[in-house]
Swiss-Prot record:
It catalyses: (R)-4'-phosphopantetheine + ATP + H(+) = 3'-dephospho-CoA + diphosphate. This is Phosphopantetheine adenylyltransferase. NCBIfam families: coaD_prev_kdtB, cyt_tran_rel. PANTHER family: PHOSPHOPANTETHEINE ADENYLYLTRANSFERASE. GO terms for molecular function: ATP binding; pantetheine-phosphate adenylyltransferase activity. HAMAP family: PPAT_bact (MF_00151). Substrate binds at residues 14, 46, 78, 92. It is found in: Cytoplasm. Its EC number is 2.7.7.3. GO terms for cellular component: cytoplasm. Keywords: ATP-binding, Coenzyme A biosynthesis, Cytoplasm, Magnesium, Nucleotide-binding, Nucleotidyltransferase, Transferase. InterPro entries: Cyt_trans-like (IPR004821), PPAT (IPR001980), Rossmann-like_a/b/a_fold (IPR014729). Homohexamer.
C-alpha cells in the first residue's frame, strides 16, 4: 500500500464521454497538484456507449496539454485505485445543488474506506454547469449537435457509435 500524498489527486469518473465540463475541472485542478490522475472507471453496470479503451484514449487526447495529468482506466473499487495511485486527494465535480447529496454520500463512504484521503469538490465554470455525459450521449443518440459540449474527437466517436447502432 502506498502512502497518501496530498500532492497527488485522483479525479474518477466513467467519462462516457469526457465533456468540456470535465476538461474545465482538470484545467483548474492541474495547477493545484503535482500530479492529477484521471481515473476512467470500467463501470459495465452503467452500460457505457464507449469502451473503456476508447474513453481512456479520448480523455488522454483531450488532456494532453497537461504534463502532470495522466489518464488511467480501472476496474477495481475506487478506494483501491486511489491507494494504488498513492493519492491523498479525491477530486469530485459539483455542477449543481442536485449533485451534492449523492457526492456527500460518496465522500462519507470514501472517508470510511480511505480515511487518509480527503475529498475536494470543485465546481465547473458557469458555462459548463449544465453539461453531463448522460445528456451528451442522449443528444448524440438522437442525432443532435453536441459540438458545443465535447471536444471534436468525442463528437466523431459518438457519431461512429450512432452509425454502428443504426447499421445493427
Amino acid at each position: 500500500m502506498s502512502v497518501a500524498n496530498s500532492r497527488t489527486a485522483v479525479y474518477p469518473g466513467t467519462f462516457d464521454p469526457i465533456t468540456n465540463g470535465h476538461i474545465d475541472l482538470v484545467n483548474r485542478a492541474a495547477p493545484l497538484f503535482e500530479r492529477v490522475v484521471v481515473g476512467v472507471a470500467y463501470s459495465p453496470s452503467k452500460g457505457p456507449a464507449l469502451s473503456l479503451e476508447r474513453r481512456v484514449a479520448l480523455a488522454q487526447e483531450a488532456l494532453a496539454a497537461h504534463a502532470n495529468v495522466e489518464v488511467r482506466g480501472f476496474d477495481t473499487l475506487l478506494a483501491h485505485f486511489v491507494r494504488e495511485m498513492g493519492a491523498g486527494v479525491l477530486l469530485r465535480g459539483l455542477r449543481a445543488v442536485s449533485d451534492f447529496e449523492y457526492e456527500f454520500q460518496m465522500a462519507s463512504m470514501n472517508r470510511h474506506l480511505i480515511p487518509e484521503v480527503e475529498t475536494l469538490f470543485l465546481t465547473p465554470a458557469e458555462q459548463y454547469s449544465f453539461i453531463s455525459s448522460s445528456l451528451v450521449r442522449e443528444i448524440a443518440r438522437l442525432g443532435g449537435d453536441v459540438s458545443g459540449f465535447v471536444p471534436a474527437s468525442v463528437v466523431e466517436a459518438l457519431r461512429q457509435v450512432r452509425q454502428s447502432r443504426a447499421q445493427a
